[in-house]
Amino acid sequence: SYFSIKFSNLQFSTKLIDGKYPDYEKVFPSGDPSTLSIKKEKLQLALSRASVLSNEKYRGVRFALSKDSLKLTANNPEQELAEEVLEVDYKGSPLEIGFNIGYLLDVLGSVESTDVELVFYGEDSSCIIKEPSLESEVYVIMPMRL
């Protein structure tokens, strides 16, 4: 019940698990989506600036989305506040949702495209991040309460 691969100076081993593989598709939200389209670098830079003042333990950032506008807010226990408003292409109902800023930056660092889409299904549902030109890769980020 083990699987092993050996290369010249590398060995990879894993234990095979008996059981049913979890239904990963349940992680993907469904419903009426709201979509944010933005240049990856524009969002990365804004999140990097906000991360300076985010809470070191929870690293939260709040997204306040409305027609063609994204307001990013991060704060810390010292009552310092970072706030930035970005002009974006947003289609959907107004929405406020929080995320771990580190997770967002990690995903954006993995995306190769210059543009990204963030698809929201409500404040309590996960967010899908994808490259518009590459439908086969999607990233799922769970929201956090702020």
Residue ranges and their predicted role:
Residues 1-17, 32-146:
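DNA polymerase processivity clamps
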